[in-house]
């Protein structure tokens, strides 16, 4: 797992678009924000958040973003290349982002579409619980939250 930055924006955007097509189809909405994001927006986002990726043979196959505001870490754009989904990369990257978050983060939040069966299962498996839902175009977003668990003996 390596840090990503603005120089990785082209690869991140390509990966993101490939990964979100499935979600767009599941929700009948091709206007999902990750599919509409421009290269400049991706570059700006990577300059302002913490982001990590996994490469295999030089190819970016998974990435995630973490936005920290006070005690809250918001996980976003957790994506895995379609041909590598189901291999544990998403869960591994999620755990990595949680462990790499600054010490002041006490809670993690994220959201996904209500029809995103795979991601909802992944997040539940990793301890995330639904807090509420909000309307988004012709579907709902499911908002989830998880309290940070500090390893025993770790100073907070």
Segments and roles (model prediction):
Residues 53, 59-68, 74-79:
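Conserved beta-strand in the GNAT
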Residues 39-53, 74:
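A short helix-loop-beta-strand connector motif used in the catalytic cores of GNAT acetyltransferases and
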């Amino acid at each position: 797992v390596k840090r990503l930055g603005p120089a990785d924006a082209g690869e991140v955007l390509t990966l993101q678009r490939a990964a979100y097509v499935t979600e767009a189809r599941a929700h009948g909405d091709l206007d999902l924000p990750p599919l509409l994001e421009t290269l400049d927006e991706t570059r700006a986002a990577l300059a302002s958040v913490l982001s990590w990726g996994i490469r295999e043979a030089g190819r970016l196959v998974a990435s995630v973003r973490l936005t920290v505001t006070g005690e809250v870490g918001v996980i976003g754009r957790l994506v895995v290349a379609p041909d590598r989904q189901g291999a544990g990369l998403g869960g591994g990257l999620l755990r990595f982002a949680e462990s790499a978050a600054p010490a002041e983060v006490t809670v993690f939040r994220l959201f996904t579409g209500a029809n995103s069966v795979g991601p909802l299962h992944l997040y539940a498996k990793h301890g995330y619980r639904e807090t509420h839902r909000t309307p988004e175009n012709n579907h709902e977003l499911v908002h989830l939250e998880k309290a940070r668990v500090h390893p025993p003996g770790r100073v907070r």
